[in-house]
A protein has these predicted regions:
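Well-ordered mid-protein domain cores that form the structural environment of catalytic cofactors
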Residues: 68-106
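DPxDG-like acidic metal-binding loop motif
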Residues: 113-157
């Protein structure tokens, strides 16, 4: 299935649905919202197992699960609305200079473009960070996130841009999207600098560190799989101009051990 994921540039729908039904996108979600609320080391072990099979799938599991910890920062009713559906997945992309939110009565008018939103195909909601334009001049949330807010939007309200063709992570479906003058209610926004409602367990770890440790674990899992494949090949292949297996060559010992 890994070849199919890479070719199709997404996790197959039947597989992502099965993963969602079995709770693999709710591993770090609080138990109060129907999640597993795993301890961080246990989560990383699961990531490494997935990465050993397919790096893109593991990447999406990390991205989508780590974002779910923000459920403790956003309004409680909004978190319940989003994760009340078992197959709920929120994808987010880093802020860009092409985004802005203008305050209006009861919320914001949101416009912009965002990139690298991993898991776009199986996501149900979008989280778009944008600076608040308050009359003090233009802002760039990609450089200064002070005062920026994250807007939570059903996926069917954004314009999807198929621009993702990256070797190695092609299957993450990390596509771009655009929004033009969309009204977002205030209760579907939050400030990412807000402290979570409780900081026990994994929720006491900064979000940036959660992302970093998860993605580095994905890299380690892929590396382990690559080493195993190399060792397997070395035990079967006889290189040209040699009568001995590759595993007996000094160069193999130097590189692999």
């Amino acid at each position: 299935v890994s070849d199919q994921i890479d070719h199709d540039r997404q996790i197959p729908t039947n597989l992502s649905d099965e993963m969602a039904d079995k709770g693999f996108f709710r591993l770090l979600l609080p138990q109060s919202l129907g999640g597993s609320e795993l301890k961080h080391p246990d989560f990383l072990q699961i990531l490494e197992i997935f990465a050993d099979v397919d790096g893109s799938t593991a990447w999406c599991i990390n991205q989508n699960n780590v974002f779910s910890t923000n459920s403790l920062r956003m309004p409680e009713d909004t978190a319940k609305e989003i994760w009340g559906e078992q197959r709920a997945v929120v994808t987010n992309g880093p802020p860009t200079s092409l985004s802005q939110a203008i305050p209006v009565d009861g919320g914001y008018r949101l416009s912009g473009r965002w990139n690298f939103s991993s898991g776009m195909d199986h996501a149900t909601w979008i989280a778009a960070m944008a600076p608040i334009i308050d009359g003090t001049g233009p802002k760039d949330a990609s450089r200064d996130r002070t005062g920026a807010r994250i807007m939570l939007i059903p996926k069917d309200q954004v314009k999807f841009l198929d621009l993702w063709q990256v070797n190695g992570l092609r299957g993450t479906a990390s596509f771009s999207y655009e929004i033009e003058d969309l009204y977002v209610p205030m209760d579907h926004t939050y400030d990412p600098t807000w402290a979570p409602r409780h900081i026990t367990g994994v929720y006491g770890i900064p979000t940036t560190l959660l992302f970093a440790t998860g993605f580095s674990t994905v890299a380690l899992g892929v590396a382990r799989s690559s080493l195993d494949a190399a060792i397997s090949i070395a035990g079967e292949k006889i290189p040209g101009r040699s009568s001995n297996l590759l595993q007996s060559q000094p160069a193999t010992h130097r590189v692999i051990g």
